[in-house]
């Protein structure tokens, strides 16, 4: 059963952090590539620490082995002088899909007893 095998690795480009540059009076969009480097189909989902400022499209999906997806992380306008910019990040969570599951994302894959892996990408704001 897929849930007893730990999910393989993913690769992200960029691999360490996301950087948004001032000015912040316009919406900025940064693209991230996620690659399933493992040998099994995975379901993935993105979480953000600041849903008011950061949005992700698509927020979840399914990747076959070696398959890639390009997603957009958008930063809405904000006042850099009054906002706390220290702890923003996005977190990519992924888990193996059940054997025989259709290639359609299902939130319940993350709610069972299967292993879920996480990768954090801090957000850096250049002022």
Swiss-Prot record:
GO cellular component: cytoplasm; cytoskeleton; pseudopodium
Domain MSP, chain residue ranges per copy: 9-126
Predominant location category: other
Keywords, sorted A to Z: Acetylation, Cell projection, Cytoplasm, Cytoskeleton
Record-listed N-acetylalanine modification sites: 2
PANTHER family (alphabetical): MAJOR SPERM PROTEIN, MSP DOMAIN-CONTAINING PROTEIN-RELATED
Function text: Central component in molecular interactions underlying sperm crawling. Forms an extensive filament system that extends from sperm villipoda, along the leading edge of the pseudopod.
Subunit relationships: Forms filaments 10 nm wide, with a characteristic substructure repeating axially at 9 nm.
This protein's name: Major sperm protein isoform alpha
């Amino acid at each position: 059963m897929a849930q007893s095998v730990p999910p393989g690795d993913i690769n992200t480009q960029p691999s360490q952090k996301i950087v948004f540059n001032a000015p912040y009076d316009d919406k900025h969009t940064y693209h991230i590539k996620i690659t399933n480097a493992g040998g099994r189909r995975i379901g993935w989902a993105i979480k953000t620490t600041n849903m008011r400022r950061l949005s992700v499209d698509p927020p979840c999906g399914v990747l076959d082995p070696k398959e890639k997806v390009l997603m957009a992380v958008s930063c809405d306008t904000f006042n850099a002088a009054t906002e706390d910019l220290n702890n923003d990040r996005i977190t990519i969570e992924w888990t193996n899909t059940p054997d025989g599951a259709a290639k359609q994302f299902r939130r319940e894959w993350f709610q069972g007893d299967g292993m879920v892996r996480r990768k954090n990408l801090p957000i850096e704001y250049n002022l």
